[in-house]
Structures are given as structure tokens and as C-alpha cells.
A protein has these predicted regions:
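Anion-binding and metal-coordination hotspots
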Residues: 1-244
């Protein structure tokens, strides 16, 4: 189906060998030109979803295939593919092949550098908690990029802002009938740190942030039962001295 809607050098299906040659012919300049054109097609107010997927491989010839955090748990080395998609347009605006041993949180710096080179302004990024780190938050603030990023509840910054509202969080006024969960927004301050090598100093200031807390009582109950089942399984293994 793809070959009927896209222009390429071959008449019908692209043979495997030809596809390898075609992909190998795409230069960094070609990619950047594509990213710039796609950036101009974006919808002004849509947000961009940034995520990474892993592709397992048996190849011993591809240098980027490395042992890392394999998401499929198939005990194979992998190559990572970082992608940015428009939420409304469903268009891919950016992609980058990465070595399989690079953690998600270490890729945001490269993404921001690429967006600066491409000259794409007013980006709104949405990311999962794998990208959360102090370095990334500071980098997003530095480049004046609006963002929404998930975070683990166990993090000190997240937990310290939850503690004052914890007792009243599950009260009636914070329940959303539409989404069937409890939600509350907390305004807080982020300690922004920027190192300036040229001036030989470090800038520290407070940035306003909003934290969105959600609680799904059904999921919490399921998680608690799953934890209890895991404890029972471990108990049986200890008592029988065999893996269950």
C-alpha cells in the first residue's frame, strides 16, 4: 500500500536489497531538509509526543546495535529509534537512530540541540516518565519549550508537593466523573540551574511549575492485589525451595 501513495525510484514493491540501498542513500542533509519541511506543516497549537522504541536485532555489523534496557525482554541487543509525532496531525516531525545502550533520559539533550539547529519554534512536548531528570527539565526551561512530562511519585520533589494535599486528595470535590478518577493541580517552584562556561558561573533561579496529581482507585486496588499475589508466590518459592 505504501508504494501506491508515495513516490520512489521503483515501480511497485521495493525488494529487500533495493530498500537497503535506498535507506543508505539518505544523508543527514536529506533528513534535516525533511524535518524542516515537516516543521512548516505542523499545526500551530498541537503538542508533540516524544518517545523512543527499541528494535531488537541479531546483526553484528550495525554499530548502533548494543545491549541495553530491552523493552521486549527478548534477551537481544537493540537499536533505539527516537520519534516526535504531532498529536492532531499524526505526522512524524523528527526521528533519530540511537545506540541501544542509551537511556531515554539521556536523549532529550540531543533532541533540543536538533530542534535548535532546525529552527523550529514554539514546540510543546509531551513525554513519559522515562525522560524525567533534573538535567532535562533545566534544558527545557533553558530553551523556553513548553512541556508536560510524567514523573514517579517516589521522587522527592513530587512527593514533597503531594504531602500537603494528601489527606484531602480523595475528597468529593477532586473527583472527575468524566475520567473516573481523583485529580488535583498544585502550583510549585522549580529550582532552575544553568551553568555558563563562557562566564565561568552558575545561574540559579526559581521557575513556576504546575504538578498534576491523579489517583485511580480501581487501578490502586488492582496494583495492591498484584503485589499481594507476588508476595504469595515468593513465599511459596521460599517454602518449597523451588521457583514457581
Amino acid at each position: 500500500k505504501w508504494h501506491t501513495t508515495h513516490k520512489h525510484p521503483y515501480e511497485k514493491n521495493i525488494p529487500s536489497q533495493r530498500s537497503s540501498e535506498l535507506f543508505a542513500s539518505i544523508t543527514e542533509e536529506n533528513k534535516e531538509h525533511f524535518f524542516r519541511l515537516q516543521g512548516k506543516r505542523r499545526i500551530e497549537n498541537e503538542y508533540w509526543a516524544y518517545d523512543i522504541t527499541s528494535i531488537s536485532s541479531y546483526s553484528e555489523l550495525i554499530s548502533q546495535v548494543q545491549w541495553g534496557n530491552n523493552r521486549e525482554d527478548d534477551r537481544l541487543p537493540q537499536i533505539n529509534l527516537a520519534m516526535v509525532f504531532g498529536e492532531e496531525s499524526n505526522l512524524p516531525f523528527y526521528y533519530r537512530e540511537l545506540a541501544g545502550n542509551i537511556w531515554d533520559s539521556k536523549t532529550v539533550k540531543n533532541l533540543l540541540a536538533d530542534l535548535n539547529v532546525l529552527g523550529i519554534p514554539k514546540v510543546k512536548l509531551v513525554m513519559d516518565r522515562g525522560f524525567y531528570s533534573e538535567e532535562n527539565i533545566n534544558g527545557l526551561f533553558k530553551d523556553h519549550i513548553k512541556f508536560l512530562i510524567a514523573a514517579r511519585i517516589s521522587l522527592k520533589f513530587i512527593k514533597s508537593n503531594l504531602d500537603p494535599i494528601y489527606e484531602t486528595f480523595r475528597s468529593f470535590e477532586h473527583y472527575s466523573e468524566k475520567y473516573d478518577l481523583y485529580a488535583q493541580t498544585v502550583q510549585s517552584k522549580w529550582t532552575y540551574v544553568e551553568m555558563r562556561p563562557n562566564k565561568g558561573d552558575t545561574v540559579t533561579m526559581e521557575k513556576r511549575v504546575y504538578l498534576y496529581y491523579y489517583f485511580n482507585i480501581d487501578k490502586a486496588a488492582e496494583d495492591e492485589k498484584a503485589f499481594d499475589r507476588k508476595l504469595i508466590k515468593l513465599q511459596r518459592e521460599l517454602e518449597s525451595e523451588k521457583r514457581v
